[in-house]
Amino acid sequence: MTVDELIRRWDDFTTRMAPGFPTSVHDHAKALGLRTRIAELEAGAVPLPAHLARRVADSDARFRHATVELSVPFAGYQAPRSAWWWFRRPAAMGPELEADLARVVPREGTPIA
């Protein structure tokens, strides 16, 4: 997948995140994985071109606006705190995601949502 495609997919995901956006834990985690790959590119020796960095920043702002912070990573996945996107969940969840998350309990034993 090219850098442009990776960023476009993250951008598309954050644009579609409307209240009640239908997604499953698996689909949501897959999208968060896109952001992780972008972060790996951002940490590389060659910075992202300015126009791509702006798209990522705009997408990140949309994602933050449509989500709420968690004290543990989304759905019990393992992630470093620097991967802030893993520590957020949609503010308004569709029924499939809500049901999926109700079944997931993080290692600390407290429900995520």
Task: Please place each PLM-identified region on the residue numbering.
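Short terminal alpha-helical segments
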Residues: M1-H26
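Amphipathic, non-membrane alpha-helical rod segments
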Residues: H26-A45
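Amphipathic alpha-helical binding modules
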Residues: A57-A113
